[in-house]
Amino acid sequence: MKKFLAFALLFIVACGGAIEEASVEDTVATDLEITSTTSAIETTSTTIDDSKDITGLTVLYAGHSFGRPFAENLTKTAKLAGIKDHEQRIVFRGGENGAPQAMWEDPTAKNEIKNALNDGNVDIVILICCSKELVESNGQSDKAIVEIIEYALSKNPNTKFGLSMPWADYPENYIDASEHRLQIDAGYPRYQQFAKSLTNLFPDVDVFTFYHGAVIYELRDLFEKGMLQDVDNLIGPERNSIFTDKKGHAGLLAKDTGSLIWLNAIYGINPMDIPKIEKYKLDIREVAAEVLRKYS
């Protein structure tokens, strides 16, 4: 019963993103200034030298606005790591409408996802937590995800699939970072188990999870400890706040840091092996590397 409640709460708080205009895009985003410095700190991933030989991938993100900024950032972030020719496709719906089940049950969104897959060039499909069925089944089943996988594989049998975990919305509802992260942290292992069940259903298919939402909690914790010089507000202007609104949409620092988690998930790049992001006083690579150590 406790596990079900944790997963149900995960659904309630993780379907982030206010209801926004739907869109299909092939896009890139923010400029990241860099220096050539690197670090010897290691995580289990590819190094910057190795990345020069990595072919850019075509990635489809289908989901809401607690994942969209990172998808938008991927082309720029991949270039930082020496990866050229990354292609990003996005099918977007706001809030709960961006969960896999909601998108797949919406005929228009479903057709947009299919159209993005139809040329057979998509290497990785990224979806975001959580479908209603996944919650109601206590993390046991999600027909929409299964059908999306089946459709993608029918167009490209080598497609891989990533299930991303965002952060809890409405950050002011939580007294601090520790409370903010509690419910999603509790539900994430069940999400990982669900991904493992998909690999049993599709034995030759790579289905993986990643938890970019954990970056938000790390940044909030640093802010609350007075250790985040780049941020003046919990909620405020995008350039100097963790969140841009009460809903909890990410500010620039959170977007850029979370993008390093996406880079690792998709390309296996160690955050500490890309050039330092010089626009911030904080070394956001260290924050991303810490998240990967905790949740990989």
Region locations from a protein language model:
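Immediate post-signal peptide segment of exported/extracytoplasmic ligand-binding proteins
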Residues: 51-56
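Structured segments of extracytoplasmic/periplasmic soluble domains
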Residues: 69, 73-84, 116, 151-155, ...
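Alpha-helical cap/lid subdomain in secreted, periplasmic
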Residues: 114-252, 264, 273
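Histidine-centered active-site loop/cap adjacent to the catalytic His
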Residues: 234-296
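Bacterial lipoprotein signal-peptidase II cleavage site
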Residues: 15-23
